[in-house]
């Protein structure tokens, strides 16, 4: 979902309220883990997203599903927040609210988000190398990696931090070679 002005007016207060609750109870780290769990659950279960977004599914059914799926994994405050979103008919905005919360948490902890695209999953040493490179690029002490797979890269990685892009993919190198060769003609 693109964050429009209306979207921002809805998302930000909920994300800020969750952050305020986390800070006042000294649970920012725990809430961060819980939100990451929820986002992962939504990512791996499109059916869950569809049920939560469906206005024809009764709120009590949505609450029962959330209690069953997330209650054992998340803090009680986070569960109550999810149930509040159901009551307020905002549960369909769960994913963008969680992403907004993560952005607030990164700002609070001075953490930089690096979006890494590669052909295959990075190994732990490769992840650490990317983290060190991003720390050098940004001067930040903490880096959060968001990884994505793209088989069209052929090999290598693309690292995006804010507006900076470091393209060390084979596809990018081939494109640069092609541009160089076409500039000679």
UniProtKB/Swiss-Prot annotation:
This is ATP synthase subunit delta. F(1)F(0) ATP synthase produces ATP from ADP in the presence of a proton or sodium gradient. F-type ATPases consist of two structural domains, F(1) containing the extramembraneous catalytic core and F(0) containing the membrane proton channel, linked together by a central stalk and a peripheral stalk. During catalysis, ATP synthesis in the catalytic domain of F(1) is coupled via a rotary mechanism of the central stalk subunits to proton translocation. This protein is part of the stalk that links CF(0) to CF(1). It either transmits conformational changes from CF(0) to CF(1) or is implicated in proton conduction. Its main location: membrane. InterPro entries: ATP_synth_OSCP/delta_N_sf, ATPase_OSCP/d_CS, ATPase_OSCP/dsu. PANTHER family: ATP SYNTHASE DELTA CHAIN. It is a peripheral membrane protein. GO terms for cellular component: plasma membrane-derived thylakoid membrane; proton-transporting ATP synthase complex. SUPFAM superfamilies: N-terminal domain of the delta subunit of the F1F0-ATP synthase (SSF47928). F-type ATPases have 2 components, F(1) - the catalytic core - and F(0) - the membrane proton channel. F(1) has five subunits: alpha(3), beta(3), gamma(1), delta(1), epsilon(1). CF(0) has four main subunits: a(1), b(1), b'(1) and c(10-14). The alpha and beta chains form an alternating ring which encloses part of the gamma chain. F(1) is attached to F(0) by a central stalk formed by the gamma and epsilon chains, while a peripheral stalk is formed by the delta, b and b' chains. Keywords: ATP synthesis, CF(1), Hydrogen ion transport, Ion transport, Membrane, Thylakoid, Transport. GO terms for molecular function: proton-transporting ATP synthase activity, rotational mechanism. Belongs to the ATPase delta chain family. It is found in: Cellular thylakoid membrane. Pfam families: OSCP. HAMAP family: ATP_synth_delta_bact. The keyword Signal does not apply. It comes from the Bacteria.
